[in-house]
Amino acid sequence: LVAINALNQDSPIESIVASSYQAVSGAGAGGPIELMNEVEALGLGQQIEPKVFQYQIAYNVIPQIGGEAFDGYTSEEMKLQNEGRKIMHLPELKVSCTCVRVPVVRSHSVSLVVRTREKISVERARQLIAAAPGCRLVDDLANKRYPMPLDTSDQDLVFVGRIRDDLTSENGLNIWCCGDQVRKGAATNACLLYTSPSPRDYAASR
């Protein structure tokens, strides 16, 4: 949450819409193993029964993390919403989340639509985020530079990019963040903490 907290210091945030793309290691050590086993089996033309996830995760995304909790939202989505309000000390903040499991070993990503009371320009948002402790701005679409899980794994920073005006709201910004959920927990960024070995550890063990 360090990235959006930097914006909140400049103009109070009124609402957040977040879509979280969570790595398989967020489900524990068995997540990456199941992903790799499925990739290997499918390469041989075989099918294996998923045990960690509800469905095959290889070459797939699963739009459910946790059980059904409230009015169509999952427990993970409610957790993310409630933690955001608590950490930012904004109990009335309007937050809506969708959490998706993706076939990435490590490092969660989140797409944000942040609406503030007063308009924050894209350039001002970049300045605020670049100066925020724990953040690294990687935002150069013309040169294909933006945060990706492959580049943010095993890093202590939250990487932020794709900052642009939201076309549905005068005071909205669209933001993309990536962070290693092992190194940076929910108390300091938009990712949820869950310890697991790194991709290199899994590769070396096979």
Regions found by a protein language model. Name each.
Residues Y194-P199:
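Conserved small/polar residues in nucleotide/adenosyl-binding loops
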Residues S205-R206:
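Hydrophobic alpha-helical segments, chiefly the membrane-spanning helices
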Residues R124, I129-D139:
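A common structural junction motif
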